Curated annotation (Swiss-Prot):
Location within or outside the cell: Mitochondrion outer membrane
Gene: UGO1
GO biological process: mitochondrial fusion; mitochondrial inner membrane fusion; mitochondrial outer membrane fusion
The name this protein goes by in its record: Mitochondrial fusion and transport protein UGO1
GO CC annotation, single: mitochondrial outer membrane
Organism from which the protein derives: Saccharomyces cerevisiae (strain ATCC 204508 / S288c)
Chain segments carrying region Binds FZO1: 1-294
Length: 502
């Protein structure tokens, strides 16, 4: 080591014989010396001027112990020479206090808390706007409604106009008007006819559908005038009130939060075993092994959806049941929760050991397929458009957002039938599984449930139902896509319009 230093100094002296590191001054405010570090014109190092070094004698002893055995002995001596002997200035009293001051930084934690609070309010407010439409879509997917259209027969001849003697019929007309005033006026004839038509629905359901043992309660069911989302929302508002529009709002928020958290935890855990970067910190397109990263994203999504399956069941239960019945009944000596609105109480009733084996294969399959569909389009989209079309979201924002819109439209077209079948399967499971502690009684439903006999029954159309009903709720999805696409286009940054300032 010493020989190398001597050789380096000799070669440096041969190149610049006039240069002396100890006395050479180029006019800089600080000079770097290999043996001492950065030194100011007065001969003191930068390390000797730190507040943590000048704080107390305790810190001086720690610094001496740190640099005493170091090969940079001259640097240690310069630090000791520059230490102040006047004691502490009252700000930091030692090295331990310095570390705690960095950890308990009020400004830093305040900024983090403000960011979390801002994100919380943004997500929750977004859910408040979206939830009424999602509730209406789920009711359309699982409910069967009798919609009667009122038509006017144009071929029927109109009644002829009869001329009468006003003076002779005056007394009779006054009597008719008095009788007419006493009659009760029906201001809503259409709604009355729909309610009367739906009143016969339990009798028909009892004869045709043997899977549901009890008919629905007519006083709780909603009767929309059509299957349009707005009509369903109006009917729900008339039946359940304002809070009926935000059914399971907090449960949905908790489900979304847990879904993101668990999926992030799974990807972070499994990425270390697969030897690939976490997809949440590095996009799949930038991964050194794209296939492993893509499989990791799909697997984490599937595991997350399976773990949160009980919460998804509870969310469906809260939406399809009414607020008006709240009681606990005993069935076979066991307390069965019939219509509690508490997520904490309902999740306590779930047991994977008891209820996991009773989950039908259809529900497992539909849950996994729905998760794969979401992960496939979200994770594989950037990879496909970059490799096939050479489109990148930072340099080609308009084209990227347009391609993303078409990709989301295709995802919605595939997602709706899977979601429709999954909701029917969940409601059928909630109605008929006897081992389920929070089993739903059919008299608590606000809709008449559609018949569900399995996926193959729907595919083969054995029930002679309209297969177009599998895409119920597509209007809400399309409106959401269009609004999201419009926001992305308005928030885009036009690179050509920006000027770089120096």
């Amino acid at each position: 080591m010493n020989n190398n230093n001597v050789t380096e100094a000799t070669s440096r002296a041969q190149i610049r014989p006039y240069y002396d590191p100890d006395s050479f001054n180029a006019g800089y405010s600080a000079v770097f010396k290999p043996d001492e570090g950065v030194v100011d014109p007065h001969g003191y190092t930068i390390a000797s001027k730190l507040n943590v070094i000048n704080s107390s004698p305790t810190t001086k002893r720690m610094a001496n112990a740190l640099f005493k055995s170091s090969p940079m002995k001259k640097l240690s001596n310069s630090v000791n020479d520059g230490l102040s002997l006047e004691g502490s200035n009252g700000e930091i009293t030692g090295l331990n206090n310095f570390e705690w001051a960095e950890l308990v930084n009020i400004q830093k934690w305040r900024k983090i808390f403000e960011q979390l609070l801002d994100m919380f309010f943004r997500k929750y407010f977004q859910l408040l706007i979206q939830q009424p439409f999602d509730v209406a879509r789920l009711l359309i997917q699982v409910g069967e409604f009798k919609i009667f259209k009122t038509t006017v027969d144009t071929n029927k001849p109109q009644a002829p106009i009869i001329l009468r003697d006003e003076e002779g019929d005056g007394a009779a007309r006054e009597g008719e008007e008095d009788a007419y005033d006493e009659e009760e006026i029906d201001f809503f004839p259409i709604e009355r006819k729909i309610a009367e038509a739906n009143s016969t629905a339990p009798i028909m359901a009892e004869e045709t559908d043997h899977s549901h043992h009890e008919p629905t309660d007519i006083s709780l069911t909603i009767a929309p005038q059509s299957l349009h989302t707005i009509d369903v929302i109006n009917a729900l508002f008339d039946q359940e009130g304002i809070r009926g529009l935000w059914k399971a709002n907090n449960t949905t928020f908790i489900y979304n939060f847990l879904s993101l958290s668990i999926d992030t935890w799974f990807t972070g855990l499994l990425s270390s075993f697969l030897g690939v970067p976490d997809p949440y910190f590095m996009e799949v397109i930038n991964s050194p092994d794209i296939s492993k990263s893509f499989i990791l994203a799909l697997g984490a999504g599937v595991f997350t959806s399976i773990i949160l399956l009980p919460v998804d069941l509870i969310r469906t239960r809260l939406i399809v049941t009414s607020f008006k019945k709240k009681k606990n009944v005993k069935t076979d000596g066991k307390n069965m929760v019939t219509n509690t609105r508490s997520l904490r109480q309902l999740i306590r009733c779930w047991s994977w050991r008891k209820n996991g084996v009773s989950i039908p294969l259809d529900m497992w399959s539909l849950t996994i397929l729905q998760s794969i569909n979401n992960s496939f389009f979200n994770k594989l989209f950037d990879l496909v458009i970059y490799n096939q079309f050479h489109i990148e979201k930072y340099s080609q924002t308009v084209m990227y957002n347009t391609m993303k819109f078409f990709s989301k439209s295709l995802e919605l077209f595939i997602k709706l039938p899977l979601e429709n079948l999954l909701r029917r399967c969940q409601l059928n499971y909630l109605l008929n599984d006897q081992r389920l502690s929070f089993k739903v009684d059919s008299t608590e439903l606000i809709v008449k449930p559609k018949k569900y006999n399995g996926i193959w029954d729907v595919i083969r159309n054995n029930s002679n139902t309209n297969r177009g009903q599998l895409w119920n709720g597509w209007k809400v999805g399309v409106i959401s896509l269009i609004c999201g696409y419009g926001l992305q286009m308005m928030n885009k940054v036009d690179i050509n319009m920006e000027q770089e300032k120096f």
